[in-house]
């Protein structure tokens, strides 16, 4: 049996009698748990082999351990904060037979977790002596060998079947014992082996196999979140911009009450999460003016990310927005409409934040006695003090945890974390574990536009979702590579595809008209289960502060931006109906909840992109064909990879476009014409993928 040999410094894995290798999903050699959500089909694979011609088989062993989140690190130089201790839920493990794939000695299985918490799995390898015996016996019978030559083989088979019978319930043993008796009865080998080779015996042994040399594989973890961790549509809004205008046409500062009045419109578009930038008091020292001016006018509202003033810090709401009770009412109103509120967690301070007065050790002090402000040379951000996590980690860790738990207690279960790559990685591992141990339903979105090593590393450390480079992927080859990467990293990274943010107005939206807004929405909403947009996208807001910049003109980060959504909708200047339809289609099709099953199909036109998805649980299948040209029609031949759809090359079938309602009869090759003046994409309801094909297509390669 394989096991772990513990040395003085290094742990080595000792090979077993049956070798088990290349197990997946395993993240960083098992250091971190893989990710899944309740109801997600999790594919597992492993290489299982032994010497010679002896048959091997594999069993997937799955166990639910409970809701306690795995702690990857302790708080430095201090006790770990006490958390509620609940006894582990003892659940009988699931034993799932694995099947061999196209590659020899590679076995596949899958399981579907049904509750939030930590699940474990391992792959057990074992010798299959009856399969070995049957295979050899059939070959010898086919070669015409007689009773004398097969005497030992027949007796060996009888012994194996008798052994197997001891592991079968008494009421089901008779066929095995009868087959063993026949093998021991002198006579023609074909007659003696007839019972042993029947499908009835084969099916019985599939349920109750005789296992030799059982080797237990290493155990690995899968953390299972609630479904919103994978599938959801996000809408970002500034509550302060919802106050409308006064009689003179000047913007009025919004409140949680005026923001709540916008919630029915947002829910009506099909969004699941309303994300709020920081709602805390804004610093008054070195406050930024409009369009990021270093000098603020007396009426300028400042940037919400410059958190803290004499009015409070991270655990306080801005007095112009209302009270904490008003915030609670806003959260309740969103919940009543079927939405959640996500809150920005920006761990930085304005110079007049209470922390800067009371805890100078949480910042970096310069030789002249001043606190260092944020810089990205040559840029300077005098209105922001970055935190220093090394001077007093115990105190700062505890305070951030207190802040997060404060907002959890007020109904926030999703945090969008600002620039987590600028904070220590062990801090995030500690914080996420502490929070999720108390409430496993709390989720974290990482806003880290940083190189892959850090972006993916944050996902491994526990971040539920991640921002991505989708915004900058605009060509066919870039989008294809990006989509394939979504599937490749699905074991630990869930991208949330935002089409825009208050910081990012990509050039394709600045210069390609309303059609490109629809195109990017289709791509984001259908390539990933999680997608989002920042308020104003539905109004085609596209003016940059200057040519070559991705900053919005009159950026809402620095001023109030009320909008008249109703008038735009009445005048046909709104993408709202199309976004609503997109989110309806997403909810209709479980295929859009999948990360692993995206598959690209060939279109002989670089301005057209085609990809499909299927749901391994139901077989639901969709195919998206989207144009990348916002100004004119594009046509081409679409060549479907029929095997990837569970079909034969000669199949013909009817499909329905979920955007237009039109129906077509399709086959392997199909003429496509997309005119953005009519619709920027086909979203095709395809025939369901057959059950057998689903299992095969979900296998890891």
From Swiss-Prot:
Molecular function as annotated in GO: hexosyltransferase activity; hydrolase activity, hydrolyzing O-glycosyl compounds
Family to which this protein belongs: Belongs to the glycosyl hydrolase 13 family. GlgE subfamily.
Keywords, comma-separated and alphabetical: Carbohydrate metabolism, Glycogen biosynthesis, Glycogen metabolism, Glycosyltransferase, Transferase
Binding site for alpha-maltose 1-phosphate: 288, 348, 383, 419, 557-558
Assigned EC number: 2.4.99.16
This protein's pathway: Glycan biosynthesis; glycogen biosynthesis
Pfam families: Alpha-amylase, GLGE_C, GlgE_dom_N_S
Catalytic reaction equation(s): alpha-maltose 1-phosphate + [(1->4)-alpha-D-glucosyl](n) = [(1->4)-alpha-D-glucosyl](n+2) + phosphate
Keyword Chaperone on entry: no
Region (Disordered): 286-317
GO biological process: alpha-glucan biosynthetic process; glycogen biosynthetic process
Listed SUPFAM superfamilies: (Trans)glycosidases (SSF51445)
Species per Swiss-Prot/TrEMBL record: Mycobacterium tuberculosis (strain CDC 1551 / Oshkosh)
Top EC category: transferase
Function comment: Essential maltosyltransferase that uses maltose 1-phosphate (M1P) as the sugar donor to elongate linear or branched alpha-(1->4)-glucans. Maltooligosaccharides with a degree of polymerization (DP) superior or equal to 4 are efficient acceptors, with DP5 being optimal in the GlgE-catalyzed polymerization with M1P. Is specific for the alpha-anomer of M1P as substrate, since the beta-anomer of M1P gives no activity. Exhibits an alpha-retaining catalytic mechanism. Is also able to catalyze the reverse reaction in vitro, releasing M1P from glycogen in the presence of inorganic phosphate.
PANTHER family: ALPHA-1,4-GLUCAN:MALTOSE-1-PHOSPHATE MALTOSYLTRANSFERASE, GLYCOSYL HYDROLASE FAMILY 13 CATALYTIC DOMAIN-CONTAINING PROTEIN
Sites annotated Transition state stabilizer: 503
Protein name: Alpha-1,4-glucan:maltose-1-phosphate maltosyltransferase
Record's keyword annotation contains Transferase: yes
Active site: 418, 447
The protein's assembly and partners: Homodimer.
């Amino acid at each position: 049996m394989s096991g772990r040999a513990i040395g003085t410094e290094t742990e080595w894995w000792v090979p077993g009698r049956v070798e088990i290798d290349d197990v997946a999903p395993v993240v960083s050699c098992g250091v971190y748990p893989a990710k899944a959500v309740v109801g997600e089909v999790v594919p597992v694979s492993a290489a299982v082999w032994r010497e010679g011609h002896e048959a091997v088989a594999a069993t997937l062993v799955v166990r639910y351990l409970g809701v306690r989140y795995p702690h990857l690190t302790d708080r430095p130089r201090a006790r770990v904060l006490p958390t509620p201790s609940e006894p582990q839920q003892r659940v009988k493990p699931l034993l799932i037979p694995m099947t061999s794939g196209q590659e020899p000695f590679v076995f596949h299985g899958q399981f579907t977790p049904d509750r939030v918490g930590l699940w474990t799995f391992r792959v057990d390898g074992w010798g299959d002596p009856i399969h070995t015996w049957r295979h050899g016996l059939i070959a010898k019978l086919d070669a015409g060998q007689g009773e004398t030559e097969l005497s030992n083989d027949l007796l060996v088979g009888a012994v194996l079947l008798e052994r197997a019978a001891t592991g079968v319930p008494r009421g089901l043993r008779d066929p095995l014992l009868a087959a063993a008796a026949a093998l021991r009865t002198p006579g023609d080998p074909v007659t003696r082996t007839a019972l042993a080779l029947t499908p009835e015996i084969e099916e019985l042994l599939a349920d109750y196999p005789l296992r030799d040399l059982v080797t237990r594989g290493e155990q690995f973890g899968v953390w299972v979140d609630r479904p919103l961790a994978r599938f959801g549509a996000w809408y970002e809004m500034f509550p302060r911009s919802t106050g409308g205008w006064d009689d003179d046409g000047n913007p009025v500062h919004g409140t949680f009450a005026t923001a709540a009045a916008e919630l029915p419109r947002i829910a009506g578009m099909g969004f699941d999460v309303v994300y709020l930038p920081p709602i805390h008091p804004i610093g008054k020292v070195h406050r930024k003016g409009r369009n990021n001016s270093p000098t603020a006018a007396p009426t300028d509202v400042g940037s919400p990310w410059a958190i803290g003033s004499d009015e409070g810090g991270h655990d306080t709401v801005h007095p112009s927005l209302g009270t904490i009770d008003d915030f609670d009412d806003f959260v309740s109103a969103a919940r009543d409409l079927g939405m959640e509120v996500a809150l920005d967690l920006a761990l930085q301070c304005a110079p007049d934040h209470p922390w800067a007065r009371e805890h100078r050790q949480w910042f970096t002090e310069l030789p002249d006695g001043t606190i260092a402000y944020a810089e990205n040379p040559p840029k300077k951000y005098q209105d922001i003090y970055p935190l220093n996590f090394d001077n007093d980690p115990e105190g700062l860790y505890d305070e951030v945890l207190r802040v997060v738990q404060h907002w959890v207690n007020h109904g926030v279960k999703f945090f969008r974390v600002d620039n987590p790559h600028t904070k220590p990685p062990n801090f995030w591992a500690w914080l996420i574990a502490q929070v999720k141990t108390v409430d496993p339903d709390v989720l974290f979105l990482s806003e880290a536009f940083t190189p892959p090593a850090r972006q993916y590393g944050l996902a491994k450390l526990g971040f539920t979702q991640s921002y991505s480079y989708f915004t900058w992927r605009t060509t066919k080859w870039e989008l294809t590579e990006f989509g394939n990467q979504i599937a490749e990293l699905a074991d630990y990274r869930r991208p949330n595809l935002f089409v825009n943010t208050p910081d990012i107005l990509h050039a394709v939206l600045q210069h390609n008209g309303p059609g490109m807004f629809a195109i990017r929405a289709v791509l984001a909403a259908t390539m990933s289960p999680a997608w989002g947009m920042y308020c104003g996208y539905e109004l085609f807001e596209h003016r940059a502060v200057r040519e070559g910049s991705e900053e919005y003109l009159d950026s809402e980060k620095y001023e109030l931006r009320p909008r008249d959504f109703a008038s735009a909708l009445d005048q046909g200047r709104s993408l709202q109906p199309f976004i609503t339809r997109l989110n309806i289609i997403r909810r209709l099709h479980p295929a859009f909840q999948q990360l692993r099953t995206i598959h690209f199909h060939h279109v002989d036109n670089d301005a057209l992109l085609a990809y499909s998805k299927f749901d391994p649980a139901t077989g639901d299948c969709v195919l998206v064909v989207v144009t990348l040209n916002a100004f004119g029609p594009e046509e081409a031949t679409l060549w479907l990879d029929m095997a990837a759809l569970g079909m034969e090359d000669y199949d013909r079938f009817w499909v329905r476009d979920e955007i237009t309602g039109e129906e077509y009869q399709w086959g392997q090759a199909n003429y496509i014409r997309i005119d953005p003046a009519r619709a920027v994409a086909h979203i095709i309801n395809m025939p369901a993928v057959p059950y057998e094909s689903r299992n095969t297509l979900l296998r890891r390669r």
